[in-house]
Amino acid sequence: LSLEPLQRTLIGRRLLQVSRESLRRIFFLSYAWRLTHKKKFLARCEDELLTVSKFNDWNPSHFLDVAEMTMAVSIGYDWLFNDLQAKSREVISKAIIEKGLTPSQDSKYNGWLRGSNNWNQVCNAGITFGALAVYESQPAASLALIERAIKSIAIPMKEYAPDGNYKEGYSYWGYGTSFNVLFNNVLEKIFGTDFNLNSQPGFMQTASFYENLIGPSGQPFSYSDCGGIEGLQPAMFWFADKLKDPSLLFIEKKYLQTSKFNVKSNRLLPAAMLWANGISVKDIKEPAQKIWNGNGGNEVTMMRTSWWGGKEIYVGYKGGSPSVSHGHMDAGSFV
């Protein structure tokens, strides 16, 4: 509430840090408003929405910036819709259409539609949130974008086959898979179906891949581009709920117990609250599986003697190729 309004300030060619902070602020504030109905959250969230809606653009030359900003504004617009001033709704919806949806149809900016990495997942999720937010006023155009996204996002989802291995490694699993989960989840909420996306080979197994990457030290097996421990991962709660497998949250439970979640950087944190509904902490037990093997284009194997206790032995080994997205010359590396 005390932070200065965001400005359209690029770092190099990117507005991404502003888009991500906008998503964090708007997601947190709109969630707080719906939870508490305290006017201070509504007023500040409306200000945030209007501020970014009045930017001259959302930097389509680096489309991740547009995707995250579109998702941010769409969440706020939808969750606050009945409480926003009429003039604000007009400004915000116009921004979603002109600065989010329209540039996604320009071939100069939408090469991600054919990509097989996190860009496809993030951009399709952001644009779909935007299309759903303005669906009532733009039904035909919105439906076309949603149908396009369903076809397009199937491309990177094929990369999870056959076992759930994510080629880009630990850190980018947290990015690409989280936005893929947001995409699948919103389709189910609105249309009552996931359009068979959840049944893509390997996708529902990928939560086990991510959980097994964490060793007894609490650090991940850090191959490919990896910034180290990410902390609480909201998408894991979605998988645990879908699969009715609380053991997928064993590491997340440890993060909660040790406060390893950062409200200043985890812009998707409110989603954990939504997806954790109905999951009891007492039901979260140690996973039975101690060996995980993932085939695909960046093969990896992890094994351990136990999950916690202080005397565990953990081994991680990878094969694969350095040519995958965010890959390194690390075939044969191990921990």
Question: How would you label these PLM feature ranges?
Answer:
Residues L3-P220, C226-G227:
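Aromatic-lined, polymer-binding surfaces characteristic
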